[in-house]
From Swiss-Prot:
The keyword Repeat does not apply. Disulfide bonds join C37-C56, C40-C63, C44-C65, C74-C120, C85-C105, C90-C114, C94-C116. It comes from Arabidopsis thaliana. It is found in: Secreted. One of its GO terms (biological process) is killing of cells of another organism. This is Putative defensin-like protein 179. Its main location: secreted. Belongs to the DEFL family. One of its GO terms (cellular component) is extracellular region. Keywords: Antimicrobial, Disulfide bond, Fungicide, Plant defense, Secreted, Signal. Residues 1-27 form the signal peptide.
């Protein structure tokens, strides 16, 4: 029974780590060239929403449009928490592994896991 629990915990940890790695590579900013500067701001906002920012690049006369997506909170994991790696160590590991990562030890199925929250 304990072997099954350990295997299940290992697979769950791998799934969390994989999902968090996929979320890390998603961009939060979209920059697009909308050709000529004519009605630049209007076209930018129509295509990417009211919070988008437009800029006419003078020398080449092209309209640049940047849209920003709000930061999303994601959850990941690093390793098990132990006496040698308590909550402060877990928090440090999360900060190293994930951008703006913060972590803490959480009891799950009889194990103390280091769980991280980070913006993605």
């Amino acid at each position: 029974m304990e072997r099954t629990s350990t295997s299940l915990l290992f697979l769950l940890s791998l799934l969390i780590i994989f999902a968090s790695a996929v979320n890390q590579i998603r961009a939060q900013t979209c920059d697009e060239n909308l050709s000529s500067c004519e009605n630049c701001d209007q076209r930018c906002k129509a295509k990417h929403g009211p919070s988008s920012v437009s800029k006419c690049n003078g020398p080449d006369g092209t309209c640049g449009c940047a849209s920003f997506k709000p930061a999303k909170l994601c959850i990941g994991a690093t390793d098990m928490c132990t006496d040698k790696c308590p909550t402060s160590c877990c928090d440090r590991q999360c900060a190293i592994k994930y951008k703006n990562g913060k972590g803490g030890c959480v009891d799950y199925a009889g194990y103390r896991m280091c769980i991280c929250e980070y913006t993605c």
